[in-house]
């Protein structure tokens, strides 16, 4: 099953935070979040591993946050609702969301466009996040911050 959402349908945080995706690894683990990249449940992340299938799941890889500097401008692509209800609205740079068994977020800001892919290895507790960049030529300093964790998947951190 394939899904596509374009920029116009992704721009609003509140109307998209409840639209979710999920990918499973076949042994009880999974990845999942919203189509704008912000988690809205304690059990969402890029790898919720099942070490003892069906009874024991742990959040081990929550997500990645991206930001970059180009030509003196900083672009923070983080999308999140913080505990004080402050929003980080990186989804305003989101050009598309695609799901075909692999998740793909397409972003564009400044003179940089890039795609972020998220996938799980079948039959293993392994998550992959890959990036594909299209830069117009201006130098870019790109920072990826992985948010790791180790907690029971329904506990809050």
PLM features per residue range, with description:
Residues 1-157:
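Terminal accessory carbohydrate-recognition/targeting modules of carbohydrate-active enzymes
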